[in-house]
């Protein structure tokens, strides 16, 4: 093989090895509601950041089903699956024990009506509303469209789902 043949072979080998190297698995997900960001952190501390859309219910903890608030707290990815509306849906373990305790206290003191329910089906998913792109410079009111979930672009949720195994912690804060 001549010199140019070796150069081509080395270039192809480098391309194949870099393409075959999967992104590192995620150790923790951190979602900052005010910043509208989701950070994927691997075991070495490397961070990948994505812009996110949330529920339009604003800052603070989720009180009840239908308040359109993205919850604040410590959760885990419990399972995932394909979704016609959201490409992939990665379900979180909301409500957790702390959420249930808060909800029951709010019902007991009359802050919430007797018929209120705590809700569920909170997750990380794709599915951008038709006609706009989260990459555009839009206001928070235009950006926040979910019922309390965390949404990224469809191509992003595909990449995220490959890197985040079930059971991984998800911390959501108001920062």
Mark where each language-model region is.
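Exported/periplasmic cell-wall-interacting domains
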Residues: 24, 81-175
């Amino acid at each position: 093989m001549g010199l140019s043949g070796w150069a081509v072979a080395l270039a192809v080998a480098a391309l194949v090895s870099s393409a075959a190297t999967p992104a590192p698995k995620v150790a923790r997900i951190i979602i900052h509601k005010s910043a509208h960001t989701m950070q994927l952190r691997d075991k070495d501390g490397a961070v990948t950041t994505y812009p996110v859309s949330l529920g339009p219910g604003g800052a603070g903890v989720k009180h009840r089903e239908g308040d359109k608030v993205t919850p604040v707290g410590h959760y885990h990815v419990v399972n995932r699956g394909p979704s016609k509306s959201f490409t992939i849906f990665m379900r979180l373990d909301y409500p957790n024990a702390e959420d249930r305790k808060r909800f029951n206290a709010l019902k007991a003191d009359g802050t919430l009506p007797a018929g209120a329910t705590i809700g569920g089906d909170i997750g990380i998913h794709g599915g951008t509303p038709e006609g706009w792109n989260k990459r555009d410079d839009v206001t928070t009111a235009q950006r926040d469209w979910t019922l309390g979930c965390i949404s990224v672009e469809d191509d992003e949720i595909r990449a995220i789902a490959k890197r985040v195994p079930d059971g991984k912690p998800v911390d959501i804060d108001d920062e």
